[in-house]
């Protein structure tokens, strides 16, 4: 099946010492499988790669392929409309009898836009983000149980996991589950293992991920989160506090720079939310018309 094929492609080994061509082919093959059957291959291959039975190169290839697949799935795809009435299509259709067309001007205007641009970003959460967090938690538990000493390779892997999670949120920002995914990734990255890690590479990755999440959030969900004090607003405030502390006191210059990036992105996110609230009408009901407008309570948002 597709999942077994994905695992087999992941473990393909080069017949010669020159492994670069096969490495590229492996990543391209995994990306193609993730795009074609994300729900079948994504969870299985991610779980296998982070189970402890694969080396660092296999894990990095898997995460790189996941990122490439998400980029393709979230990109708009050109799909011809079924009701296209352009001139080219009319020439290939032989009509019998007399056709009556109502609202010809509207139909003619609609025919000018002959393509729609859907995407498959809605499958990213179940296919990649959820399995990746679950596999990462399992890997952390295995390392804790075995008293594993964190080295540079482990820090690189954990940092890439966080960055891939940030890309998951970025590619799902226009889905209705985007704010929930952002909250989940922020809560995961703000854990003490990442944000307070002894390894600076992991701390830096945590704050870069927070910045990616903050730049991906749209204004209205953030405004609603601050108005209702939902877990998303609490996660944003928690990361703002952590980033402020690390920006002031961390000994690593790269971590301080990453914390500054996170602070700037979080402040921009709050500012967009505040502007969105200010642009909404004060009265939820316009008595001059029968329409009802949406209103969000004007909760104070401190920057």
Listing of model-derived features with the role each one plays in the protein:
Residues 2-84:
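Helix-rich alpha-solenoid scaffolding regions
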Residues 53-55, 59, 69, 78-303:
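Long alpha-helical repeat scaffolds
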């Amino acid at each position: 099946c597709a999942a077994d094929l994905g695992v087999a492609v992941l473990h393909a080994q080069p017949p010669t010492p020159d492994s670069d061509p096969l490495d590229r082919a492996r990543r391209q093959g995994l990306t193609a499988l993730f795009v074609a059957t994300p729900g079948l291959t994504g969870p299985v291959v991610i779980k296998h790669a982070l189970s402890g039975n694969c080396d660092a190169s296999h894990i990095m290839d898997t995460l790189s392929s996941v990122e490439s697949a998400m980029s393709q799935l979230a990109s708009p795809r050109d799909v011809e409309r079924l009701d296209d009435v352009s001139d080219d299509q009319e020439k290939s259709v032989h009509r019998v009898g007399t056709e009556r067309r109502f609202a010809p001007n509207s139909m003619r205007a609609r025919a000018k836009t002959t393509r729609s641009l859907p995407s498959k970003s809605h499958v990213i959460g179940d296919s990649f983000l959820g399995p990746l967090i679950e596999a990462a938690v399992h890997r952390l538990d295995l390392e804790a149980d075995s008293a594993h000493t964190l080295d540079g390779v482990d820090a690189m892997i954990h940092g890439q996991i966080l960055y891939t999670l940030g890309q998951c949120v970025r590619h799902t920002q226009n889905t209705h589950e985007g704010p929930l995914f952002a909250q989940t990734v922020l809560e995961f990255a703000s854990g003490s293992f990442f944000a307070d890690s002894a390894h600076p590479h992991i701390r830096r990755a945590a704050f870069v991920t927070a910045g990616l999440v903050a730049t991906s959030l749209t204004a209205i969900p953030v405004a609603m989160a601050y108005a209702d004090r939902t877990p998303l607003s609490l996660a944003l405030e928690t990361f703002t506090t952590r980033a402020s502390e690390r920006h002031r006191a961390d000994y690593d210059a790269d971590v301080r720079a990453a914390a500054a990036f996170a602070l700037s992105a979080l402040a921009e996110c709050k500012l967009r939310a505040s502007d969105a609230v200010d642009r909404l009408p004060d009265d939820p009901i316009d008595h001059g018309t029968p329409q009802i407008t949406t209103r969000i309570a004007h909760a104070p948002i401190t920057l």
